[in-house]
Regions:
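Membrane-interface alpha helices of multi-pass inner-membrane proteins
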Residues: 158-174, 179-180, 185
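Intrinsically disordered, polar/acidic, low-complexity terminal segments
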Residues: 2-93, 97-111, 198-206, 226-234, ...
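Perimembrane helix-loop-helix junctions
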Residues: 179-213
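Hydrophobic, aromatic-rich transmembrane alpha-helices
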Residues: 261, 265-304
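Juxtamembrane "helix-exit" motif on the non-cytosolic side of transmembrane helices
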Residues: 33-40, 68-72, 119-129, 192, ...
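Transmembrane alpha-helix segments characteristic
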Residues: 23, 114, 299-325, 375
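Membrane-interface micro-motifs in multi-pass membrane enzymes
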Residues: 54, 58, 83, 87-89, ...
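Membrane-interface transmembrane helices that cradle and orient dolichyl/undecaprenyl
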Residues: 143-159, 191-197
Length: 512
């Protein structure tokens, strides 16, 4: 085992620390979703699929879905334990590569970095799409591996391989662009710290990294266009997918400002009120530590200070690059995993600049460590609240559908061959259904929102999945202007379900 590890250059001690930490934090934060099954919204629609692929610009996700189906010889499944474990292991691998390359020495910092990334709210959000979660985070890992290869070798072959891996990463999920850029910037900072490079060497390194970014984005779009032509589809306009990054100059400036603002005050990435302020305080404390470090570099009259400062200026918008890709209001928490790389920057500063610390600097570093620990704890609490909310939502949903099915099948004239017609199916109301708003805060993380789940776009699929009821559906338009339907009350009132012309009509809402 030791010889194998030596040949592969595996840091066994670090590997054990990261795996144990990821397991510990993963169980604390995500145990409920790993050992239960919550399936509604997209998860029930794509239970046996990997999600939207080519029409959403996710060509690599389509390829991976096909490979998985062919290799396993079965459908894709939204498996909580398997998919969740793979996801957490991918995050652990990301942490391992970052820590190993950045040469982080402090074990407590490694444990906290692992915790901050495993418990980050974007992971919680992605677990509501369990059918595709492992693919998303395997893709994030792919981008980090690409940057790691380029950082290790720094030659043309490594550069090309890096761009290919990053293009594949983005081809699974476009929000992996920030992951790729942040990793490149972190490795640049470590290279600057380790050597006294002159400005020529710095700009050469910056140009190489810019070439990587331009290269993988170009490759992504070229391959994407190939698959669009191959399958004869066009990009969807969902969340601005069909016009990623295309806008006017003034809106670019607005998006950049939103990105910087989100880095310091992450109202989308970190929704929990207390965690958001702890995060902001952590970033401020880290910024003060960075100022002290840069001041010492300036006194030593080395270019390191200015070089590091340039990367620090770019880092916030790199972490929040999704704000440049789409309109700020289209950004949701699942898209913000790149912002978790802010914690790698925090840990790097605390671990790498301990020399000649004053009491104030030492106190700031201790405060940053404490804040990181508090943030991880708050994120764990937040995740568990959302999973409990999902459990209650799903239980209420099943109860609602069970009652609905019973009433439909109890109507005089019902037969198993009768078509069922739903009128106003996405505008259901029930004053006696308390819902979850009375017991839970109005948390907006997809897909744990507070709106009635029985009005979800996939409500019929959820009823079929959980209750096994899938009648043949009739066309609601057939009853437009029908006098008998107009006279019917709305569900759940008595008389809201009737057999009309041999079809079971369920009226949820009046016609607009």
């Amino acid at each position: 085992m030791e010889k194998t590890a030596e040949k592969l250059k595996v840091n066994e001690s670090l590997l054990k620390t990261v795996l144990c930490s990821a397991t510990f934090w993963g169980l604390l934060a995500h145990g409920m979703v790993l050992f239960n099954k919550y399936s509604f919204h997209d998860d029930v629609r794509y239970f046996n699929e990997v999600g939207a692929t080519y029409e959403s610009g996710r060509w690599m996700l389509g390829i991976l879905g096909s490979l998985s189906a062919n290799l396993l010889g079965s459908k894709n499944y939204s498996l909580p334990v398997v998919n969740g474990t793979i996801t957490i292991l991918c995050i652990a691998a990301i942490v391992y590569l970052l820590v190993d390359s950045l040469k982080i020495q402090s074990k407590p910092l490694v444990i906290l970095l692992c915790g901050s990334m495993v418990t980050f709210p974007s992971v919680t959000g992605t677990f509501s799409y369990m059918f595709t979660a492992p693919y998303y985070y395997a893709a994030s890992l792919l981008g980090v591996v690409g940057a790691w290869i380029f950082h290790q070798k720094k030659n043309v072959v490594a550069l090309l391989l890096c761009t290919v891996l990053m293009a594949c990463s983005v081809g699974v999920y476009q929000a992996n662009i920030p992951v790729c850029i942040c990793t490149l910037l972190l490795y640049m900072m470590e290279d600057i710290r380790q050597s006294d490079m002159n400005w020529k060497a710095f700009w050469k390194m910056a140009l190489c990294n810019a070439t990587v970014c331009i290269g993988f984005v170009t490759e992504y779009f070229l391959v994407n266009q190939y698959f669009l032509n191959q399958f004869g589809v066009v990009l969807t306009d969902y969340k601005g997918i069909n016009h990623f990054g295309r806008t006017n100059l003034s809106n670019y400036i607005y998006r950049i400002l939103c990105g910087y603002g989100s880095f310091f005050y992450p109202s989308t990435a970190v929704e929990d009120f207390s965690a958001r302020y702890v995060y902001t305080l952590l970033i401020i404390v880290t910024a003060i530590i960075a100022i002290f470090v840069l001041r010492k570099m300036y006194i030593l009259k080395t270019p390191k200070g200015c070089q590091t400062l340039l990367i620090l200026i770019a880092y916030p918008i790199a972490a929040c690059f999704v704000y440049l890709m789409v309109e700020p209001w289209d950004v949701h928490a699942v898209m913000t995993f790149g912002q978790a790389f802010a914690f790698a920057l925090v840990v790097w500063f605390i671990d790498k600049y301990p020399e000649d610390r004053t009491k104030v600097e030492g106190a700031l570093c201790k405060a940053a460590v404490a804040l990181l620990g508090v943030l991880v704890t708050l994120n764990i609490r937040y995740s568990n609240i959302l999973y409990l909310k999902a459990d209650v939502m799903q239980t209420q949903m099943i109860s609602y559908y069970t009652t609905l099915i019973t009433r439909i099948e109890s109507i005089e004239g019902y037969t198993e061959d009768a078509q069922v017609v739903y009128i106003g199916e996405y505008d259901k109301h029930d004053k006696n259904l308390v819902g979850i708003s009375e017991y839970f805060d109005d948390l907006d993380l997809a897909t744990y929102r507070g709106e009635p789940i029985f009005n979800d776009y996939a409500w019929k699929e959820a009823m079929e999945f959980w209750c096994g009821f899938a009648p043949e559906l009739g066309d609601a338009a057939e009853f437009d202007g029908n006098a008998e339907v107009a006279s019917m009350p709305c569900y759940p009132d008595q008389g809201s379900i009737r057999c009309i012309n041999g079809k079971i009509v369920v009226k949820f809402a009046d016609e607009p």
